[in-house]
């Protein structure tokens, strides 16, 4: 139920952005945060945009999800399992978005003065949470090994 809920929430926010903003339109929320409608044809942060077919990106993402799912099954650590779960949720949601649109909708834009972080979405946040948790589990594991 959590998996479906998080994917639904990500896809819903992407739909609402597409339905209410024009492409590249930005709405200032506060000094550091804007909502913006960006079509990401590449991978994270728009890398490889226009250089690789969306079908290739989908195939690569599916292979990565399968590998991470294997790690999820093999792991006996709760923190690792939760971390893999978040990465899988984020990846699946972006895969679904790419299947629907041929691109991924990004809409969260963080900035400070003249520095702008590339736009991202909730699925990217799920993936980032999972990666941070994996790093934490690595440090916890290495600390207990000593």
Would you name each region that the model predicts?
Residues 1-146:
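Alpha-helical transmembrane bundles and membrane-interface segments of multipass inner-membrane proteins
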